[in-house]
């Protein structure tokens, strides 16, 4: 089961705050304070924090990371929690970076960053 499917199944069946709590709205489940899971369409799933899709998985195996202009410790923690294994957001000298440790370790400045074809990771 890939990460996207795992998120969907976990949040559909969750019944307590630590595992997720259904909101009663179709396609939306509260994961923890102000963090929601949302089915964008039949192929796309997003983790939404304070109204911003911070991690978005599409049906092609691509992942989009987005801080929405809110560079807080909690936003960074939520992105790291739901990003694919091997992709990490960190801060150095007040700037955000993304570290990709999957194949050849590399570090790049954080923007609204899209990872192509990470299907085998998610």
Please give the residue ranges for each predicted region.
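Terminal leader/tail segments of proteins
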Residues: 1-122
């Amino acid at each position: 089961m890939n990460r996207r499917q795992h998120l969907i199944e976990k949040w559909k069946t969750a019944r307590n705050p630590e595992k997720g709590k259904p909101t009663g709205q179709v396609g939306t489940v509260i994961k923890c304070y102000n963090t929601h899971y949302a089915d964008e369409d039949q192929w796309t799933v997003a983790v939404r924090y304070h109204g911003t899709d911070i991690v978005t998985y599409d049906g092609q195996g691509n992942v989009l990371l987005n801080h929405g202009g809110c560079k807080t410790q909690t936003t960074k923690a939520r992105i790291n929690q739901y990003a694919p294994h091997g992709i990490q957001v960190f801060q150095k000298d007040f700037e955000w970076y993304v570290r990709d440790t999957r194949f050849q370790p590399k570090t790049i400045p954080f923007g609204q960053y899209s990872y192509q074809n990470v299907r085998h990771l998610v």
